[in-house]
């Protein structure tokens, strides 16, 4: 079974591709049945389907698919999910076994309907800009914002809010001069107060009335702050060009007064009044931490350091709990109205992403960490948000909902990904809760072709009524979203997997160890948000030991007899590198960095997630000038090679000692050493290819053996050779790693002993 081919067609990978037939047998497989699903998986071969889907009767509402039984003579179909009989609509009167509509063809198990009813409002982009920055940083941000106006569709609505000590809401409909409404940054305003001060309706205005109001040239209140780009581009560009750093004086021993929380509160209040239940992005550009008003993460006094993991663990971070409550309250409001929040940081210090993470993670917003708005990491990442497809449509999707239907043998445990629960109960909701559980429907305010969700299942069948023979379980994913072309799209994916008895080799052979590693990594990262780090590591180890006890071949109490089949051989090393990854190890990372890493793990597909868990390493040498994959191990560090490390977040080129000396001597500039010049260039060419579709842009590092930046490589290598390892004559190896971490070899040795031990 080629898992990657299935992923290309349907955007889905299951941990097990043959399901155990009973609940008890399923619990014994240790790794839960889970699908890593990419709803907007790019399928250039999908033909446009410009009509409403045929659905089953309520409450089922499953969509017609290739697994339905069709009676072409009597013109009815039987739903495989509820077994109800449904008549085909009149337009299907000419259907026959040789002339089937596209949704019934086996190769179109994934199909996308373009629905005839358009959204009432075009997508909205509200820029929330921090002006507490130095002039160079602010100028770079202004330039990027002006460029972005040309990347957005001209009919999109845009707005501008700036903040420092005060918050300014700009009235783009006023063209005589730059006009803004000013709010005090230290005050906690209610939604009603903000809407009244801005002259906005305090109750949800109907989208139809809003559309009519927009026809007036700025006379209607809702249209003053959010206007189509084609109507306000000149005015907005002028305002951006005139923005100046915050003029409020800052003492030498103080931080600037930055009211990020108040600015976000005002932005959310404005959006929920002007464009409720409509697609949109609130894009926060923060140049530092919030220091005043609601959502403060650190005081203005420089003698008070911003919180660390150590402070949070010891309950010594005095602002954290209050800030978390505030931002989680904003998250509930913004997600209820279908708006995503993007957080783009341009600061060497932390800005409070740990406190604000729910705003992005629960709404499907983007997170970008950069040292400054002048860096290419920010500039290129920001522009990639507005990327286009082959038809010149923005890749962004808005205000999506996903419903998962299953046949009666399966129930849903939950979802882990960038979504919020719609709290919709149905008969296929299971008892076990993993992630966002107790529902079969979720909302994703922001969604893109890269957005990936882990959905967890349980087998509902008791042993007495186990499925017989060639029975199979069906799962249907229904994703409704607002497309950037201002149409509603419904993406439908229907997949089937067979059931087998618990001891069947079919189950073992169907294990997708890569998808399983990612599914378990998401659970571990989810647990790490609420549990202590050591507890999560112990849980990860327990699950691995149990899996090996169940599926390995061994003799009791004989570690040398331990064998794993080819379907399981990579899984233990994935778990080893997961234990050492920044998702579970917070040492040497700030709370903001940890929040960012976990956010990205919950967004990317299987292949990219595996790069995050176990980075890839390539070696370039005179024997292999084109580069070859090598072990992520200390033995790969040699003086005469160049290494290229890809951790997803960093791309690092590491020059061995000898290569670095030759380069520093300038040999590559001499004609007779052309091969050295080509060798030095080869990793850079490979790195450029890795950057083509990566988001956000990774940090690019070039270093030499023994240099300070080499720590980024050494920290991710398996420490098979450390300062405690002796080579010839008792001396440590030349490339020893100074660490007390256990090596992969020691880890596997302990795993074998524990797995074969008599319980």
From Swiss-Prot:
Membrane topology value: Peripheral membrane protein
Cytoplasm keyword on record: yes
Classification lineage: Eukaryota, Fungi, Dikarya, Ascomycota, Taphrinomycotina
Gene from which this protein is expressed: sec231
Keywords: Cytoplasm, Cytoplasmic vesicle, Endoplasmic reticulum, ER-Golgi transport, Golgi apparatus, Membrane, Metal-binding, Protein transport, Transport, Zinc
Gene Ontology biological process terms, A to Z: COPII-coated vesicle cargo loading; ERAD pathway; intracellular protein transport; reticulophagy
Entry-linked InterPro entries: ADF-H/Gelsolin-like_dom_sf, Gelsolin-like_dom, Gelsolin-like_dom_sf, Sec23, Sec23/24_helical_dom, Sec23/24_helical_dom_sf, Sec23/24_trunk_dom, Sec23_24_beta_S
Database matches in Pfam families: Gelsolin, Sec23_BS, Sec23_helical, Sec23_trunk, zf-Sec23_Sec24
Binding-site positions, Zn(2+): 56, 60, 79, 82
Main location: cytoplasm
Keyword flag Metal-binding: yes
Primary role: Component of the coat protein complex II (COPII) which promotes the formation of transport vesicles from the endoplasmic reticulum (ER). The coat has two main functions, the physical deformation of the endoplasmic reticulum membrane into vesicles and the selection of cargo molecules.
Protein name, as recorded: Protein transport protein sec23-1
């Amino acid at each position: 079974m080629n898992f990657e081919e299935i992923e290309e067609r349907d955007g889905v990978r299951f941990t097990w591709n043959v399901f155990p037939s009973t609940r008890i047998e399923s619990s014994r497989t240790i790794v839960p049945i889970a699908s890593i699903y990419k709803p907007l998986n790019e399928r250039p071969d999908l033909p446009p389907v410009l009509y409403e889907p045929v659905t089953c009767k309520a409450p089922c509402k499953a969509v017609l698919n290739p697994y339905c039984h069709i009676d072409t003579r009597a013109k009815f179909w039987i739903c495989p999910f509820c077994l109800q009989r449904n008549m085909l609509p009149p337009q299907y009167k000419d259907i026959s076994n040789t002339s089937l509509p596209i949704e019934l063809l086996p190769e179109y198990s994934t199909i996308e309907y373009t629905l005839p009813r358009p959204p009432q409002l075009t997508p909205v982009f509200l820029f929330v800009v921090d002006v507490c920055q130095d002039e160079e940083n602010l100028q770079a941000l202004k330039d990027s914002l002006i460029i972005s106006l040309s990347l957005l569709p001209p009919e999109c609505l845009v707005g501008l809010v700036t903040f420092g000590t005060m918050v300014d809401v700009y009235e783009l409909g006023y063209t005589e001069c730059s006009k803004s409404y000013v709010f005090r940054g230290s005050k906690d305003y209610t939604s009603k107060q903000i809407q009244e001060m801005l002259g906005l309706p305090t109750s949800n205005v109907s989208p139809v009335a809003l559309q009519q109001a927009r026809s007036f040239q700025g006379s209607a209140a809702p249209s003053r702050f959010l206007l189509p780009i084609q109507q306000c581009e000149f005015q907005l560009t002028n305002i951006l060009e005139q923005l100046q750093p915050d003029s409020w004086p800052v003492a030498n021993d103080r931080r600037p007064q930055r009211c990020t929380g108040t600015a976000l509160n005002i932005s959310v209040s404005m959006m929920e009044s002007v464009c409720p239940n409509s697609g949109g992005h609130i894009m926060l550009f923060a140049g530092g931490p919030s220091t005043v008003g609601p959502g403060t993460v650190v005081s203005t006094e420089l003698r008070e350091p911003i919180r660390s993991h150590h402070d949070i663990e010891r309950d010594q971070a005095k602002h954290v709990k209050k800030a978390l409550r505030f931002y989680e309250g904003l998250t509930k409001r913004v997600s209820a109205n279908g708006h995503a929040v993007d957080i783009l940081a341009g600061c060497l210090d932390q800005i409070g992403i740990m406190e604000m993470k729910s705003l992005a993670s629960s709404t499907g917003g983007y997170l970008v960490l950069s040292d400054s708005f002048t860096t290419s990491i920010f500039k290129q990442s920001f522009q990639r948000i507005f990327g286009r497809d082959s038809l010149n449509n923005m890749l962004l999707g808005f205000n999506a909902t996903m419903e998962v239907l299953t046949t009666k043998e399966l129930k849903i445990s939950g979802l882990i990904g960038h979504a919020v629960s719609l709290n919709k109960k149905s008969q296929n909701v299971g008892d076990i809760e993993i992630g966002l559980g107790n529902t079969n429907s979720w909302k994703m305010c922001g969604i893109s072709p890269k957005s990936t969700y882990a959905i967890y299942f349980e087998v509902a069948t008791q042993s007495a009524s186990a499925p017989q023979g060639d029975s199979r379980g069906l799962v249907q994913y229904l994703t409704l979203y607002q497309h950037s072309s201002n149409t509603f799209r419904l993406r439908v994916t229907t997949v089937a997997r067979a059931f087998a008895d618990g001891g069947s080799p079919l189950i073992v052979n169907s294990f997708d160890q890569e998808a399983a590693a990612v599914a378990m990594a998401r659970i571990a990262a989810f647990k790490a948000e609420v549990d202590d780090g050591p507890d999560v590591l112990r849980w990860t180890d327990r699950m691995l030991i149990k899996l090996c006890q169940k599926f390995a071949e061994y003799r009791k109490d004989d570690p040398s007899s331990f064998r794993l089949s080819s379907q399981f051989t990579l899984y233990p090393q994935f778990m080893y590198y997961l234990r050492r990854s920044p998702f579970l190890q917070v040492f040497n990372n700030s709370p903001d960095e940890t929040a960012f890493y976990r956010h990205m793990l919950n967004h990317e597909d299987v292949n990219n997630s595996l790069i995050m868990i176990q980075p890839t390493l390539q070696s370039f040498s005179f024997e292999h000038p084109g580069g070859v994959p090598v072990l992520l191990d200390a033995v790969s560090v040699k003086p005469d090679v160049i290494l290229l490390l890809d951790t997803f977040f960093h791309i690092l080129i590491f020059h061995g000692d000898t290569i670095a000396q030759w380069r520093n001597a300038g040999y590559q500039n001499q004609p007779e050493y052309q091969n050295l010049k080509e060798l030095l260039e080869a990793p850079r060419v490979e790195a450029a290819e890795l950057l083509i579709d990566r988001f956000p842009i990774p940090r690019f590092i070039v270093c030499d053996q023994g240099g300070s930046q080499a720590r980024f490589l050494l920290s991710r290598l398996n420490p098979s050779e450390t300062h405690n390892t002796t080579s010839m004559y008792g001396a440590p190896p030349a490339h020893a790693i100074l660490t007390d971490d256990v090596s992969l070899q020691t880890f596997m040795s302990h795993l074998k002993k524990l797995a074969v031990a008599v319980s």
